[in-house]
Amino acid sequence: MESNMGSKNKIYVAALPIVDIDFYSAQDVLDAHLEKAQKVGMVYFSTSNRLNYKKAQKVAKVLLVSKAFTYIADVVSYTYFATKTTPLDAADYAPRIFSNDEDHHWLKLANIRPISLDELNTFEMVNKKVQAQYNGVGNYIKNTGRLQVFYATKTF
């Protein structure tokens, strides 16, 4: 049997900033998603952020980030709508406060858990210049002035 000990696995990750929305704080937004995921096993996270459709299709995990918290989740499915839309099963999987939202990007997430900045430093920014400047995703989140969507990889 051939061994593949030398080969490495690489996963792609997208970081999505969680921000205040209308009357909801970033923490409220996170909590609503955590509650729904706990109830039904998965949750929709929708965004109109400028996600790159081609990159987003390759993403295995998502980081939900703010200055106050960082979480990681598995991507169960990713759906892109050219025209902002609500998926048919949004009522089943989106937090109630967002189940009528129309958005371009809908990611169905599972296994959402907190992740430390130290553990995040085992991920590398795809942008080599930013990676060289911050030396890890955790350092970037902690020290950058403004969080935006970014992509990272982890090799193991």
Walk through the language-model features, giving the residues of each.
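Compositionally biased, charged N-terminal/linker segments
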Residues: 1-58, 65, 122-156
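Short, hydrophobic/aromatic-rich beta-strand segments within well-structured domains
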Residues: 58-65, 74, 108
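Residue-level detector of functional hotspots within protein domains
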Residues: 48, 59-61, 93-98
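Aromatic- and Lys/Arg-enriched surface recognition patch
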Residues: 70-156
